[in-house]
Structures are given as C-alpha cells and as structure tokens.
Amino acid sequence: KSIANGIDIIRIFDCMNDLRNLQTAVKAANKEKGHAQVALSYTLGDAYTLDYWTKMAKDVENMGADSICIKDMAGLLLPYKATELVTALKKAVKIPVQLHTHYTSGVASMTYLKAVEAGIDVIDTAMSPFALGTSQPATEVMVETFKGTPYDTGLDQKLLAEIADYFRPIRDDALESGLLNPKNMGVNIKTLLYQVPGG
C-alpha cells in the first residue's frame, strides 16, 4: 500500500543486521516497482570491521536492493571513519550508497562532510527548525557548505528559508505543548560512550 499511495523509496532494516529478516520486504518492494533501500544498522565493536560492512553490502546488492543506506541511528560514525567506510562500500557495490545519521553526539555535520568527500551519493538532512539533537544536520547548513564546490546541490537558500519560516512556529508550538522535548534538541557527547540510539 505504501508504494500505491505514493511512497517511492522503501527503507528496510533489521536492527541486528540479520538480512534474512529483510528478504520478504525487498521482494515486495521490487514486485511493486518501488525503490528498495536496505539499511545497514551502523554500530561499533570488534566484529564490525570494514570487511563485515562490505560483505553485508554485497549481500544486500545481490538480494535485489536498489540502494544501501548506512543507518547510524546513534550518531556514532565519526568523520574519518566515515571516509573509510564510504570509500570501502563504494568500491564494493555498484548501487548508490546513502548516509543517515543523527546529531546526538555532535559530529554529524563533520561526518557528512567527510562522507560526501569520499563519494557518498545522498545524505539525509532536516530543515533547521527540526534539525540537530536527535535529528539530522540542518539542510540549509549542508547546502551552504557545498555551495560552489563539486558537491553543490543547486538548492535555493531563499526557498529553504521560506520553508524554515513555515515550520518554525510549528516547532515552537510543539515545544510549548510538550510534544517536543527540548532535551532532544541538544548534544550529548556521552552517546559516544553508551552508544544507545536517540533518533
């Protein structure tokens, strides 16, 4: 139903990176002519080497995924590690690779910069009223960062400012009503120690 209702990219993931749990969803997305994007749930530990990630990426490509997303749900991927990971994945597979991270630990914008320089195809961002903290880096900041470089997005900052102006009072209402917790909008460097996702 998602594809029939207009969703074009179906991001599919298993928090334990057990690809057997993804096969049915990938087949269904392919059957319905959707874009099956399989996410690799990024985490840290001795087992999670570049070989681990590249093997998984190849398996995902062979499964029929249209693209891969590095899903860094806790904001653990550090900038220079992003360079290594993206470089390895881009060599391992032919399909596009996207990066999704959270600003929880405070390093996300730097991670995106290094990932883009390493050849990542897409980065996930959020409009500034809802950016940072457990969300993503601000769209406007990333657009301005890459302006005039080979990575220039071509997006119009005036239009982005209008969009941000539209959403700012919605954010303020959500804060005032308690729907949005202000604690979620800050940085907690301890995330790099306890490694629990917050986004």
Tell where the protein language model's regions lie, with residue ranges:
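Catalytic cores and adjacent flexible loops of soluble metabolic enzymes
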Residues: 1-11, 15-199
